[in-house]
Amino acid sequence: MKKLLAVILALTMVLTLAVPMLAAAEAPEEITILYPGEETDEMSAFLNGAFAEKVLSELNMKVNFRFLSWDAYWDQKSVMLAAKEPIDLYWDGLPDLSTMVNKKEAQPLDDLIAKCWPESMKEILPESQMAGGRINGVQYGIPSAYAPSSGMYQFVCLRQDLLEKVGMTEVKTAEDLREFALRVQEQLPQFRGPADVIFKPLTRNFAEEQYTWVASQDLVVFGEESKKAYSFAHTQAFQDVAKYNREMFLDGLYQDEVAIKYNERDSRMQTGLYLWVEGSLGKENEIIGSVKTADPEAVLKNYLLQPEKPRYINATGGEVLCVPYSAPNPEGAMKFLAWMWGSQDNYLFCLYGEKGKDWDLDENGRLVTLSETARGDGYFYEWMFRNANYQVFSADVSDEYIEMYKHWDDAAVPSAMLGFAFDNTGFEAIETACNEAWKKVEPILFGYVDFDENYPAALAELEAAGINEYVAEVNRQLEAFMAK
């Protein structure tokens, strides 16, 4: 009897210890994603409902989101990362990856990828795509938009319906854009003009050779033909763009907000009251749902100014996902990405919601949106996670457009600086000073202040900050990179 009691007591103790251990083993892991934009009621309902249930069921994971408004995203992101707040994954522009690495905002991902990603991910994000997220051979970011990319930052996405309504059919030059804005101002005064100063597409229009931005922010450009770096503010193209934009302001074609709230340009365009915004390949399809919600008659179309000029492939897309050093669960972040891109169903679920409720595919594999949210912005940003393996088009997108889209890069020229990342070691103070001086340059570029009155002093301040030494170092590193 005593032996039996001892056995029972022992089993009781084992079970007592085992239950919390089993509970702990089954507890879901958590990650936190820093995400740009406003959290809508629809997004909250999705994240707390169908999305939460699916990732818990399939990943045993809870995914938290911290939203930052577009106008504050970059400044607040830097503050949060510097304060080592518990963020596991965040988005930024791929051209700024080297800056983030220099600021110690992005940790190496090679070991995490090897541990957390299945072999199948090499087909979803191939080697050629992943190479764009490497600096000195180390993977610091995931180039998250896998799609054709030549002519990046050089498109203008405009209201084609309004263009035709005022008697025009297409635009090819900056003067065509100006004429469009003037006609709308005269004939359709209820519209508020352009949503964006589009300084990069305008640079394509005015520059003698095509420029690609390199190093930190907008300080330096790389000449695709001369294969040298230049201070953008010192180029003739800068002066031409600034003077063009100044005329647009003086003629009442630009509203003050396009300069003082530059980062809200996409939000403005989606109100249905504006004429154009900087585009990207496919942007007309990407934002048309939101624009049509505001103006059901809206039709969008993308244009390249000076279309006869060459197009360059200078990056593997424009978006990058990074894991900060302070991430509490970096493995969880990588597991989540592998899950999201693991199948077309998961991918479309994240973008558009529940199949059969928010969206479906017709017999031809075309996207059919069923809910107002799916017809508008969707849930996860399509442009941020776009993947050519899974991308679908709605039935109103022509077969001709899809073929053009798929073969867009066929005639493009790979840039000599493709894969280059500037290392600012030893130049951190100069870079910071130049970016501070750029705050005086930017209003000139946007046309918000008079060129002749402000340009000489702003240029002198930029030079005093060390822009010439900075450009010389960029050129030194570029020469070494291109010599490999």
What is each residue range found by the language model?
Residues 1-8:
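Positively charged n-region of N-terminal signal peptides that target proteins for export
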Residues 13, 17, 22-484:
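Extracytoplasmic/secretory soluble proteins
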